[in-house]
Design a protein with these regions (language model features):
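Solvent-exposed alpha-helices and their adjacent loops that cap or buttress functional pockets
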Residues: 17-22, 79-81, 125-127, 158, ...
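Conserved, well-ordered active-site substructure
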Residues: 130, 135-190
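Extended hydrophobic packing segments that form well-structured cores
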Residues: 189-203
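Catalytic cores of soluble, metal-dependent hydrolases
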Residues: 73-77, 99-155
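Redox- and metal-dependent alpha/beta enzyme cores, enriched for Fe-S-associated oxidoreductases
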Residues: 17-114
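Fold-independent oxyanion-binding glycine-rich loops
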Residues: 3, 30-33, 90-92, 136-138, ...
Length: 203
């Protein structure tokens, strides 16, 4: 998920860690602008009844907008107190893309800038309100882990090919389950599979 994180890959081994806990409240965080992610989020909403909190990406790109960060954090707090989880994303995920190529320097700069805002939102939420994370996008994963004072991810297995899962290996939330994926990866049900996996539904 990025050079700033230490990834300990134990997939295929028998790591000396506690049994993976079943998450009860899951926070899905995506900084992706990919149409694949938009379809996956809509599917997750429809099947699981989750609600999403959307950040105003245009505003956050041009001004600090601390009230926008506070608004999102407050709404997420309300949802996590009442429901099984919530989704944090940018409004721009659901309308036409900017047209930047994946390797465009401007696109990468925008992506990192917006991902940092996601970390700011999580930094204002009581971390006891959730016990599982699904992170979409490499910049998102780095920003979220930084905000949670986590420097290591312990990868244990894959939900499906290309969707690694594991635990936060250090920091205040050490031991909580996490699933990561790239924004463009997967089919419509990929996030739904991740949701069921992290909650251990059907096991």
């Amino acid at each position: 998920v990025g050079s700033e994180m230490c990834i300990r890959d134990r997939r295929g081994e028998q790591p000396d860690v506690p049994c993976r806990p079943a998450a009860r409240r899951v926070l899905v965080v995506t900084g992706s602008q990919k149409k694949e992610t938009a379809a996956q989020v809509r599917r997750l909403e429809a099947v699981c009844g989750l609600h999403k909190v959307l950040l105003d990406s245009e505003r956050l790109l041009h001004e600090p907008a601390p009230e926008e960060i506070s608004r999102a954090a407050q709404r997420l707090t309300e949802l996590l107190r009442q429901e099984d989880g919530a989704i944090l994303a940018f409004d721009s995920l659901f309308y036409s893309q900017t047209g930047f190529a994946d390797d465009d320097v401007a696109a990468r700069k925008v992506g990192k800038s917006l991902a940092a805002k996601l970390g700011e939102v999580l930094g204002r939420i009581d971390h006891t309100l959730y016990d599982g994370l699904i992170l979409v996008g490499g910049d998102t994963a780095v920003a979220v882990c930084r905000s949670l004072q986590t420097t290591q991810l312990l990868l244990l297995e894959e939900v499906q090919s290309g969707t690694p899962a594991g635990l936060l290996a250090d920091g205040p939330l050490r031991g909580i389950p996490v699933v990561t994926k790239s924004g463009a990866f997967g089919d419509e049900d990929t996030l739904l599979h991740a949701w069921k996996y992290i909650r251990r539904e059907g096991e």
